[in-house]
Structure formats: structure tokens, C-alpha cells
Regions:
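Acidic/polar loop-and-plug regions of large Gram-negative outer-membrane beta-barrel proteins
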Residues: 203-226, 310, 315-375, 575-587, ...
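Short, small/polar-rich motifs associated with maturation and membrane association
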Residues: 1-289, 303, 910
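Glycine-rich, aromatic-lined ligand/substrate-binding cores of catalytic
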Residues: 769-801
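Conserved small-residue
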Residues: 169-222, 319-320, 672-769, 831
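Extracytoplasmic gating/loop element in the C-terminal half of outer-membrane beta-barrel translocons
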Residues: 339-341, 795-887, 891
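C-terminal extracellular loops and terminal segments
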Residues: 649-659, 699-717, 763-780, 808-824, ...
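Extracellular/periplasmic, surface-exposed regions of secreted and cell-surface proteins
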Residues: 10, 292, 296, 300-301, ...
Length: 926
């Protein structure tokens, strides 16, 4: 069975990827376009052996996204990008990126470099970016050391030109976001009715009488029997985001410059946040100030300097970030309490305390977050033709610093609830009233990163036209972040060699020694890679204009370890209490809690890639890649090898092994017709498979082994439906999770031992981290200044556990809210057509198990971006000294299709929801 599945995925592991297209591309463009492989190594797209794809600024500007992180959805083959939130400003909550799927059970982050330095992508704006390149195979990422093992995303910012002219460009846009995608929660009546049913199932008396239920329906007593639609009371249905920028650029042969000032302002969804003295509206304001300068000190010396200053401020409710605000909606039911009591204080209750989000957004003050970042880097390149022609020396350094400061101005407020005692309404009031705002502030997070690199590069063209290139480089990086053991130093020594013969045969070799203190004591590793290429067709006038095959392989390493200070034994000073003395004094002793891991090798990736690039009829580009990777020396906990009687957590052992494999095909079509019509189109479809090959485990039954399953697969029980009656329970295997009742989940006895317990768990077919299937379709057309562009993005083959979305698929227990999705499809309401188990006020252990009831193989397709624009004709703008002018209307997420009814399948969480948006704007260049 495993072998058959493996072959199925290999045959289906196809990736059809749309490449960036803007106009008809020629072979000469392939020769002039460069692939930046890092540290001074550039190759023409025509001759490179690397699997890399680049998207230009023109293509990026076809989206309504202001942040670069939000502009890459479905845009680059091999780069899988997903939207996690509808609000900016909170680090770690932005877009998620992945290259070629899950490759390990360890660290899965890709390396993101901006102008050669690791930097956060969501702080950049689209307008300041020249190109984005994704590096995928061993030949492409060989120069970037430990951090590049999962792939690299390179961002190059804009620089000036050499036309001797002075240019400036202005642009402005306003975005309207609407229709937040969140689950509907039940009304107060439905909640009360469900609570009565749940208590009946639990053998308890009803919580509400028929008369009380009627009050929820008719609203005759809204103070004691409220029906509050918290979403409508707290949030609007639209939010706004504005952006404006001004850039100056130009230059001569000696000096080129590019400067830009960009300002973004986004407002959230709170209703009535303005309290006169303060405003608690969710707000995100950011200014980017950039200056990039390139100049020739002499005929042989060239210096480049880039600097970016970022000033960012967010505003909101104290101790309630943008995601927590929405979580409150999923927590508090409509009948919990009214907005205000009879006495006029904010509503609350004994059960939910002051979880009144309206009170928090209007009566608790406000909180601001101030972030300051500076990114600076400089490089110097010196021609050494005086020594030998083609020899150059280069040196570069960078320094980045970030500080995040939080200030709060808070005040207390009273809350309470009404109830009846002897037929008379009473009111309980809690909390204190504070007239003045109390100020507090602190440094939340900070980090600084410094890099240095130096090297020699040599380029030689032989008499027969062959080319030889060499690059010897040393680079180091110092990274200091908050927290213990978060100071990391990395150093790399590298030698890169390139040779191409007769514009047909290419070879690249990289030899690298990579060092890091993060993986101490396994600090150093040797990483060789090789890339080979052969151009079998090069005919601009034929049907097959260009054809190339590529083959690459290499060994890479990562410095990831599952815990900081892994080589140290861990001790606790709060164990082993003993008593002594006549006064019965006590003392705590030291206790070993984890054995050290001090003898291991760095996790190693063995990578292979075969690819081909084709151009057909000077209009259609095809790129095909098939790849295989095996990770070895993955650090795995050795707990399963030791008895729990020892009571000490085991060390780790480097015995894990994971394989990942798939294929990629990229298609693009671009054509300019004689009548001036420009057309471009692309398509994307990708599937990647991972498989655990070796693990430290002692499974009691074969189904408990992780070997053969995906690297990130969840494990759970196989559900057979729900118990129909007591006879069904009596005739089923013994269930050991606790008492079961009619309407509880019925499980399969996988191992056949006659009981249902953790020994019946099985792995899911797909992982939960990223979709294994990714696809996209693009289309664009322009005629006489009018144009349209559209990008569809879709994904599938990702198993998500719906129970993790608390409040939507977790119902009633612990006083949870209840979603309409759960209520309509629970056993009590839907009966034989039920999707979810019976209602209960208890934490029913049987129903809380991970199982196929809760696992969903999600899939979705979105109209991710669309644009309609008009470029003003030259005869209109030239008298105004304008070189180009464009007005546009853009949309994002305007259409969505998925297999999850309650929520957006891409964003199964209770955080700030993703929204549809319309963006109107204008850009003018002088």
C-alpha cells in the first residue's frame, strides 16, 4: 500500500508554474537578464544551471497590495505564499512562505534576503522593489549557508539609471476592505436551546424554562435575557487603507540615485472608538524613507550604499491585539450579558467577567506600539585589472537594528449584571471607575543584525569564446535577539567556479564551509554542490527557439536545533524537597530534568534536481523540473528508548531521515500583435510529497509508526460515525477514553485488539503545515492604453484539525460560544446527517480525540488579484512634461471557492479575518 501511494504521488507530483510575463520576450532578453546567486555571483538566465525564477517590478504592481509580502500570492513558481490575516502591523502574523513544500520535521522557514541581507519582507512596499527571485535547488542556494537549506527568496530594491535625467514619480491609492470572513455564531435563543439539550444529554436539569426561552425570542427582557450580536455591535463591515509615495531617481555614468518616501495608513473595524480624549481604533501607520546610491570613486572603484528607515506605529485596545479582538467574538455568546446594565455600567457576568469587547474598545483606554528600524548596507568593488584582466575585489557590510516599544494609557471601568431575586431585578457591580488614564511603557522586542563579506571574483573569456569565472568569498553574520541563547554567529568560506563552452555546455561548482554557534558543538559542515547544463537548441527563427537541460546536486546543512543550549544538561532547583531541624524547615534541591545532547551531526540535505527550459515560437516558455531531497541527521527525541520510570527527559539523537520529492512545470505565453494588442497568460499546478524514512520509535502496533507518513502529518482515530443507540454502544469495542453516550463519536479498532485507545491512531494522508497542491492561473491584456490583469490562486491536499479553531468547532464546554455551523450539523439537530457529535456542557474525552471527524482535507480557489487600468496617451501627457500616467482599479480576494462552509479555508483561525478589497489609485512619472 505504501509503495503504491508513493508511485501515485510521484506521477502526480507535477508543478505547472506561471512565470512573470509583461511583454513578448526574446532570446536576447534571456542573455541579458541576470540571475543573482549571491555575493557577487551573477549568471545570465540563458546560461545558468540553477533552478531560479524572477518577477519584476512591473508584474508586482498589478496587485492591490501595498506590502511586498502581500503581492507574491500565486506570482512565482515554487514559492507558495498564503495570507494569514487581514490587518498589518503585528510581526509574525503576516504572509507565510514556503519553497517546495515540507522537507523536514525541523525548521521549515525559508531565507528571505533584501539587498543581500536577511530582513522582514512585510516592511517593504511594492513600489520600492525592482525584482524578486526565488532560488530553489542546490545550485541556486549554495552560497547562502545554513539558513538557505529550505530555499531562498531574494529581493532587490530599486536603483537609479544612467540616462542623465532627473525623474520623479508620485502615486496614491485608497483601498476599501469589506466583508470580513468569519463564522456566524448562534442567536441567544439557539444558544439557550442548545444549552438545554446539552444539559439533558449530560443528565442535568435545563438551564432555561420555556418562558425564559421565549424572552430570548421576543426581546421582552433584554437586560436579563439579552440577545447581543457582538459582531454587529463592535465591528463595522468596512475598513480603509491609504498609501502615497514620492520617489526621485536618475543619474549619470558616474552616479546613480534612487530615493523614496512612502506612507501607509490603515484603519480597522471598531465602531465608535473615538472617546474624545483617546481613540482605540485599530490603526497601522508606517513611513519608509529610502536612499540608494551608486557612484564611481574612480574608473576602477565603485561604491553602492542602501539605507532604509522605517517608522511604524500601531494603535488599538490595551492588552487586546488585532487577533485577540476577534477571538473574543468566538468566546462570548449572545446571551452572556447585555451591552450595558440597567444601572448604565458595562455588561459582564460571573462566568465571563469583563469580556465585554465593546467596553474594552470604548472604555479601557488605548495602546500604541512604536517600531523603529534602520537597514543599512554598503559594498565596494575594486577592479584589479592592473594585476590581471577580469579580477575584482569586493567588500561589503550591513547593519540592521529594530526596536519595538509599547505604551499604554489605561483606565478601569465598572461592569455588572442584572438578575431577579424574589421577582425583583437586582444588579451586581464589579470593577472600579477611573477618570484618568494611567500611563505605562516598556521595550517589547529588539534585535540587531550585522554582516560582513569580502572576496575576489575573476572572469575570463578564452580565445575560443568560452567563459571561465571564479568567486572566492568569506562572509559572517552576527544576529542578536531577545531571550536566552538567541545570540548567533555564522561564518562561511566559499569558492564558486563557472565554465561555459560555445554557449552550449555549462558547469558550476561551489565548495563551501559553513560554521555556526547555534548548533554547538557541531559547528562546521562542508557543503559541495554541482550544476551542469546543456543548450540543445538556440534558433531564434525556428519553432523551437531555445532548449536547455539542467542537472544539479549537492549537500547542504542547517544549524537548527530543537532547543537552545541543547548541549547542556538541564536542572531544576525546585525538586527534591526535604525537611530538617527541630523547627521542620524545608529546602529544595537540584534535580536533573533533561540529559544533554552533545554528540550529533548537523542536519544534512542531499539534493538533486533535473530541469529543462524551452521557448517555442518566440511566444511560449516552458520550464520543467523534477527534484528529490533526503534529509538525514534530523534530531529526534530519544524518549521512546528510555523508560518513563527514570523521570528525566531524554537527550536527542540524530537518527531522523525524511525524503521529499515532486516536479515543476512552468508555462507562460506572451505575444504582441501587429495591431498593438498585448496578451500574456500563465498556469500553475504543483504537488510535493514528503515521507519519513527513519525515526526513533518503538511502536506497539504497526499503525503507530510514523515511518512512511508525511513529515508534518497529524495523527488521530478513524471515525465510523456516531453511536445511534445503546445497542450500538454495547456491540462496539470497549472505548477507554471515558463514558460514551448516544451521539458520541464511534471509532474504528485499527489494531484489532478489541478496545479503542491511543493505540488506534493513524497518520493522515497529508501534512498540516502547507498545502501539498498549489496552482495558479494568470491572464493579462492591453490595447491602446486599456488593460486588464487577473491572478487566480488555489491550494489543496492539506489536512487541518478543525477543533483547533476554538469557538467554531469546540462547542459549549467551558462556557464556549456556539457557531451556527456546529449547531446545524451536530447529532442533536442533524441526526443521521450529522457531521459533529452531540452537544454537551462537559469536556467529553471521547469526542475531543483527534479524529477524522475533525480532520478536513481543505481546498480553495481565489481570484487573488485583478486589475483594470488605463494609461493616458502620450499626446495628452507630454505637453505636461509627464512621461507616463496610469489610473487603475484593483481587487483582491473578490471571488473565493472552498470546501469549508463556516470560514475561509485558507485562514482557519479566530484572528483578524481576511477581507475582500477594492483599490483605486493613480501613478504619474515625470
Amino acid at each position: 500500500m505504501k509503495i503504491r501511494n508513493k508511485y501515485i504521488y510521484t506521477l502526480m507530483g507535477l508543478c505547472v508554474a506561471p512565470l512573470a510575463v509583461s511583454a513578448q520576450v526574446t532570446l536576447s532578453d534571456k542573455e541579458s537578464q541576470k540571475v543573482d546567486l549571491g555575493y557577487g555571483v551573477e549568471q545570465s538566465e540563458f546560461l545558468t544551471t540553477a533552478a531560479a525564477t524572477t518577477i519584476t517590478a512591473e508584474e508586482l504592481r498589478r496587485t492591490s497590495a501595498i506590502s511586498l509580502a502581500d503581492a507574491l500570492y500565486g506570482k512565482l513558481p515554487g514559492l507558495n505564499a498564503f495570507q494569514n490575516t487581514g490587518f498589518k502591523g503585528e510581526e509574525g502574523r503576516g504572509a507565510t512562505f514556503n519553497i517546495r513544500g515540507v522537507q523536514t520535521t525541523g525548521e521549515k522557514d525559508i531565507l528571505i534576503l533584501v539587498d543581500g541581507v536577511e530582513r522582514p519582507l512585510d516592511r517593504l512596499t511594492v513600489e520600492e522593489v525592482e525584482s524578486v527571485t526565488v532560488l530553489k535547488d542546490a545550485a541556486a542556494v549554495a552560497l547562502y549557508g545554513h539558513e538557505a537549506i529550505n530555499g531562498v527568496l531574494l529581493v532587490k530594491t530599486k536603483h537609479g539609471n544612467k540616462d542623465g535625467k532627473y525623474h520623479f514619480k508620485v502615486g496614491a491609492s485608497h483601498k476599501i476592505q469589506f466583508n470580513p470572513q468569519m463564522a456566524d455564531m448562534v442567536s441567544a435563543y439557539d444558544y439557550a436551546n442548545a444549552l438545554n439539550r446539552a444539559r439533558q444529554n449530560d443528565g442535568l436539569a435545563p438551564a432555561y424554562t420555556s418562558a425564559e426561552l421565549q424572552k430570548f425570542i421576543d426581546g421582552s427582557d433584554p437586560l436579563v435575557y439579552p440577545n447581543v450580536n457582538w459582531k454587529d455591535e463592535v465591528f463595522k463591515n468596512t475598513a480603509h487603507e491609504s498609501n502615497a509615495y514620492l520617489s526621485f531617481f536618475g543619474g549619470t555614468d558616474k552616479v546613480q540615485y534612487y530615493t523614496q518616501l512612502d506612507y501607509t495608513d490603515a484603519r480597522g473595524l471598531y465602531k465608535n472608538p473615538d472617546q474624545g480624549d483617546w481613540n482605540s481604533q485599530l490603526k497601522y501607520s508606517k513611513a519608509n524613507i529610502r536612499a540608494n546610491v551608486d557612484f564611481e570613486v574612480s574608473n576602477t572603484t565603485r561604491v553602492s550604499a542602501n539605507i532604509l528607515g522605517i517608522l511604524m506605529e500601531t494603535n488599538g485596545v490595551p492588552n487586546v491585539n488585532s487577533s485577540d479582538a476577534w477571538w473574543h467574538l468566538y468566546k462570548v455568546p449572545a446571551l452572556a450579558f447585555p451591552i450595558r446594565t440597567a444601572g448604565g455600567v458595562w455588561g459582564g457576568s460571573q462566568t465571563y467577567g469583563d469580556f465585554n469587547l465593546l467596553a474594552k474598545s470604548q472604555g479601557a483606554g488605548f495602546m500604541k506600539t512604536h517600531q523603529r528600524q534602520i537597514w543599512a548596507n554598503m559594498t565596494l568593488e575594486q577592479d584589479l585589472d592592473v594585476i590581471t584582466e577580469g579580477l575584482k575585489f569586493y567588500v561589503g557590510a550591513s547593519y540592521d537594528n529594530s526596536s519595538n516599544t509599547i505604551e499604554t494609557r489605561t483606565k478601569g471601568y465598572q461592569y455588572g449584571w442584572n438578575y431577579y431575586s424574589n421577582g425583583v431585578m437586582q444588579e451586581t457591580v464589579m470593577g472600579t471607575v477611573e477618570d484618568k488614564l494611567t500611563f505605562n511603557h516598556w521595550v517589547d522586542t529588539q534585535w540587531r543584525i550585522a554582516t560582513f563579506n569580502a572576496g575576489l571574483k575573476y572572469a575570463l573569456q578564452l580565445n575560443n569564446g568560452d567563459n571561465f569565472g571564479a568567486n572566492a568569498n568569506y562572509n559572517m553574520k552576527s544576529e542578536i535577539r531577545d531571550g536566552q541563547s538567541n545570540t548567533w554567529y555564522r561564518a562561511n568560506w566559499q569558492l564558486a567556479l563557472h565554465y561555459d563552452h560555445a554557449n552550449r555546455l555549462m558547469a558550476d561548482v561551489v565548495l563551501a564551509a559553513n560554521g555556526s554557534n547555534r548548533s554547538y558543538p557541531a559547528k562546521w559542515a562542508f557543503s559541495p554542490t554541482i550544476g551542469l547544463g546543456y543548450i540543445f537548441a538556440n534558433n531564434p527563427d525556428g519553432i523551437l527557439n531555445y532548449g536547455k537541460v539542467r542537472l544539479s546536486g549537492g549537500i547542504q546543512h542547517t544549524d537548527y536545533v530543537p532547543a537552545a543550549g541543547l548541549w547542556l544538561a538541564r536542572w531544576s532547583n525546585s525538586h527534591g524537597q526535604f525537611w530538617y531541624g527541630t523547627n521542620f524547615q524545608s529546602s529544595w534541591g537540584a534535580f536533573l530534568t533533561q540529559f544533554p545532547t552533545d554528540d550529533f551531526a548537523q542536519e544534512t540535505a542531499y539534493k538533486a534536481n533535473f530541469g529543462t527550459d524551452l521557448r517555442i515560437a518566440n511566444a511560449l516558455d516552458v520550464t520543467f523540473d523534477v527534484f528529490y531531497q533526503q534529509r538525514r541527521n534530523i534530531l529526534v527525541s530519544a524518549n521512546s528508548l528510555n523508560s518513563a520510570v527514570v523521570g528525566i527527559q531524554s537527550s536527542y539523537d540524530d537518527k531522523g531521515r525524511v525524503a521529499s520529492y515532486g516536479m515543476e512545470i512552468g508555462l507562460r505565453y506572451a505575444k504582441t500583435f501587429a495591431n498593438g494588442l498585448n496578451l500574456n497568460a500563465g498556469a500553475s499546478f504543483s504537488t510535493v510529497k514528503s515521507e519519513i524514512l527513519e525515526w526513533i520509535e518503538t511502536p506497539a502496533y504497526p499503525n503507530l509508526s510514523v515511518v512512511g507518513g508525511p513529515a508534518d502529518a497529524e495523527r488521530g482515530l478513524i471515525a465510523l460515525g456516531f453511536y445511534k443507540d445503546q445497542a450500538d454502544i454495547d456491540n462496539s469495542p470497549i472505548q477507554q477514553f471515558g463514558q460514551v453516550k448516544v451521539g458520541d463519536i464511534k471509532y474504528k479498532d485499527v489494531n484489532g485488539d478489541g478496545v479503542i485507545n491511543e493505540n488506534d491512531y493513524v497518520a493522515q494522508d497529508y501534512g498540516n503545515t502547507f498545502p501539498s497542491l498549489n496552482y495558479a492561473f494568470t491572464f493579462g491584456a492591453e490595447y491602446k492604453g486599456f488593460g486588464v490583469n487577473a491572478t487566480f490562486q488555489g491550494a489543496g491536499h492539506q489536512v487541518k484539525n478543525l477543533r483547533y479553531v476554538d469557538g467554531v468547532w469546540g462547542a459549549l464546554s467551558d462556557n464556549r460560544n456556539l457557531s451556527q455551523e456546529y449547531y446545524d450539523n451536530c447529532f442533536d439537530i442533524a441526526g443521521a446527517n450529522a457531521l459533529y457529535p452531540r452537544l454537551s456542557t462537559e469536556n467529553v474525552a471521547n469526542n475531543a480525540q483527534n479524529s477524522t471527524i475533525w480532520y478536513s482535507n481543505i481546498s480553495w480557489l481565489k481570484l487573488r488579484d485583478c486589475e483594470v487600468y488605463y494609461k493616458l496617451p502620450a499626446k495628452v501627457i507630454e505637453p505636461l512634461k509627464v512621461s507616463s500616467a496610469k489610473v487603475f482599479v484593483q481587487g483582491q480576494n473578490l471571488l473565493s471557492f472552498d470546501n469549508i462552509d463556516a470560514m475561509d479555508a485558507e485562514n482557519l483561525n479566530t484572528g483578524y479575518p481576511v477581507m475582500k478589497s477594492i483599490n483605486l489609485g493613480l501613478s504619474v512619472q515625470f
